[in-house]
Amino acid sequence: MWRSWLREAHQSFERLPYESKQDRVVEDISKAIMSIKEAIFGEDEQSSSKEHAQGIASEACRVGLVSDLVTYLTVLDFETRKDVVQIFCAIIRITLEDGGRPGRDYVLAHPDVLSTLFYGYEDPEIALNCGQMFRECIRHEDIAKFVLECNLFEELFEKLNVQSFEVASDAFATFKDLLTRHKQLVAAFLQENYEDFFSQLDKLLTSDNYVTRRQSLKLLGELLLDRVNVKIMMQYVSDVNNLILMMNLLKDSSRSIQFEAFHVFKVFVANPNKTKPVADILVNNKNKLLTYLEDFHNDRDDEQFKEEKAVIIKEISMMHA
């Protein structure tokens, strides 16, 4: 039965551009999509059939329905779009009995699927749907590697600064997933593309948008403190310009940004092999830093933070020219 639903959906999608009255075709598509969803996930309390789900994933990729789902997302109604997201994500996740992953392989063979999803961020109507499907794709390391190495990653920086809070936040969720899920892959990528990546990140850290500054600063701290990125961390904290940026963010009007900046600033101070420019800045600003840190977030009920702050204050107080 599910084969006929797949065939009906695919044929309807193919007819759609040539129909003068699309409403009826869209209605047929919506019904077929609902039936496909029920075949994958089960209806009501009934459990779904694993065999059906695997069959649907394979067939949807074979006939090109996966591309249809993302290409024509804009013409579907709100509820059908949600069904499409569920179906698409299931297809991308499904592993066959022989270990095959038809959804992953389809996307790798048809990278236009990724481009369509990515540029969906430009349409507020479907932006969040596209973001969710894009993130499902990059759960696969092969796809994440492709995205990091193509123009989409560079363009993603632009999506983080769009006017819409919802779209910018979703784009940042994608950005974070891409940089934290596959740690070894990302560590190698950051080492190879250090200058380009951090020059782009600096723009986010100095953005006029508060949310952009805070989220990018928090992500920076997470990246630097991850053991797999130790080489990146050492390179970052050796640059005096990065220290100056963090010292400025320590004094940001937002307490949240101050707090996130502290977690990066402490890495500069704790580094036993400081470069001379970094050490000079810390020594030259020693008294100001100590005065500022003594009263820094004293009302925060966080024992680990209090201990770390005490260590940083002690380390700075022991520094001398």
UniProtKB/Swiss-Prot annotation:
Organism superkingdom: Eukaryota
One record GO biological process: intracellular signal transduction
InterPro entries: ARM-like (IPR011989), ARM-type_fold (IPR016024), Mo25 (IPR013878)
Molecular function GO terms recorded: protein serine/threonine kinase activator activity
Disulfide feature: none
A Pfam family of this chain: Mo25
Annotated family: Belongs to the Mo25 family.
Name of the protein this chain belongs to: Degreening-related gene dee76 protein
Originating species: Auxenochlorella protothecoides (Green microalga)
Gene: DEE76
